[in-house]
Amino acid sequence: INTHEKKAQLDLYNEIALEHGHDIQNIDHCLSYITSVDHDSQRAKDICRQFLAHWYDSYVNATRIFDDSDQTKGYDFNKGQWRDFVLKGHRDTNRRIDYSYEI
């Protein structure tokens, strides 16, 4: 993702942390990434795609549980990405993964 999108994600993270009473200057932070290392770069990419597909499918299932509300603010960013994706005429998870790579 580009610098503007990274900043937007960090701003959202900070906003949610502050809303829950955390001092964002004095807490430990952790980032996680889906990665793979392989001599065959296509195989490494395919492995990551499988995990990313599972993550997106889990997101779809989770959003069926929650209604839009302030309590699901963390989902709003991803819901917005899904809306943009669907408005572009895409519907399947593999195409959503391709869209993520384009970002």
Curated annotation (Swiss-Prot):
Keywords: Flavoprotein, FMN, Luminescence, Monooxygenase, Oxidoreductase, Photoprotein. Its EC number is 1.14.14.3. It is an enzyme of class 1 (oxidoreductase). It catalyses: a long-chain fatty aldehyde + FMNH2 + O2 = a long-chain fatty acid + hnu + FMN + H2O + 2 H(+). GO terms for molecular function: alkanal monooxygenase (FMN-linked) activity. The keyword Flavoprotein applies. Signal peptide: none annotated. InterPro entries: Luciferase-like_sf, Luciferase_bac/NFP. GO terms for biological process: bioluminescence. SUPFAM superfamilies: Bacterial luciferase-like. The keyword Oxidoreductase applies. The synthesis of this protein is regulated by a complex control mechanism that has been termed autoinduction. In fully induced cells luciferase comprises up to 5% of the soluble protein. Light-emitting reaction in luminous bacteria. Heterodimer of an alpha and a beta chain. This is Alkanal monooxygenase alpha chain. It comes from Vibrio cholerae.
